[in-house]
Amino acid sequence: MTAEVSRSRAREPLSVSSGTVDGTWLGSDKVDTARLTAIPASNATVKTWVNGPDKNLIPIGFQPDHVTGDTGLAYSFSQCTWWAYTRRHQLGLPVGSHFGNGAQWADSARRLGYWVDSTPRHEGDVIVFQRGQYGSSPVYGHVGIVERINADGSIVTSECGAALAGHPVSRTFTAAQAATLQFIHY
């Protein structure tokens, strides 16, 4: 007795046997290319931004799931660094626990893989003021948080400091002033 193999008998074309020439992709004839090309990120907000408004802007080689450096709140109460850490957590954004003084934050974040540049992009971006910049400490610098980016490119901040007893204040910077600052995105 000879076994029949699949190539030994005639088959009907797919269009005849199934009534269609359309294939299926896991139960659907439509392939969601956006899902196939999406950049993975474990943080939901970061995932939305890297696959949405920032898709064509992120630096080459940027990895959204870089090490965050977050080991818990390590900043002294009411310091600018305490507020930046606390506010980022409130907004569900990554932030490191040991970035140093305000003026050191951009370099510390960059070393861990954060996207840092001089363009405010989203509510929650950390603003890094260099030593003495816009009234910041000439020794320590300063950090704040972007709360709003206005249509004209100006930004509204939330900031704290030791003398404020944990009560943040707000300032507005023009687009030209904002362009002189550094921003930690995610």
Residue ranges and their predicted role:
Residues 43-143, 148-150, 159:
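Secreted/periplasmic proteins that engage bacterial cell-wall peptidoglycan
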Residues 147-186:
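Aromatic- and glycine-rich peptidoglycan recognition patches
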Residues 1-90, 94, 172-186:
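Intrinsically disordered, low-complexity
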